[in-house]
Amino acid sequence: RMPLWFGQTQDYVAALRNGDNTYTGEQFAGMSNGMNATEIGLPENGVRRHSVCLGLQAYPDWNSQTTPSEDVLNITVTLPLKIMTYGEVCLLKAEAALLGWNGAGDTGENYKEGIKASLADERSFLSDASLSPSTNDETYMTTGKVAWNDNDTKEQKLEKIGTQKWLALYPNGIEAWAECRRTGYPKLSPVLHSEDANINPANHEFIRKLRYTDDERRENSENATSSSL
């Protein structure tokens, strides 16, 4: 999914364009965990060395390397907002089946169908389907940590389902955060720095609630402002 969602670093594309075979930087790179606001704003930590959310869905020319240019950050694209997808439904059914709910079907089949549907859904936004062929989908679903194994423990199965559901929810960060809070999966790296004084990275603390509306804070102040909820 990475080429669909994220842009290659500008340094990587520049090296390709210039025929630089000595480039050793990352093709896709995220911002390093632990940077403060000042460090994030430094030129050496900018988009030249880090990916932005402009993959094949938003700016196909950049990741397909057909006409890479320096105006990558000025692109404007309108994509539909996903409320609930078939892939998410399948993965919810996989979890329900694993927990013994009636009528949820087979856990493993729901899991595999959810991944397949999620990948197809992401490609549906492409202007040219050939930019992201499904050639390697089966390998992705049947190897490594993604592969379904009936002999795994219940917790291992829950982790696989939760991780794939988290991926399927992108870019709905709020729901993905809520699912991670609910299930405990995927296992995310602890925050190493926080600009919020209420979050202590030393204790592996993370965001526990989102900001409530003013009406909620006024009418339900005790619960809306409680640090324990």
What are these regions (language model features)?
Residues 3-229:
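Acidic/polar-rich alpha-helix caps and helix-coil junctions
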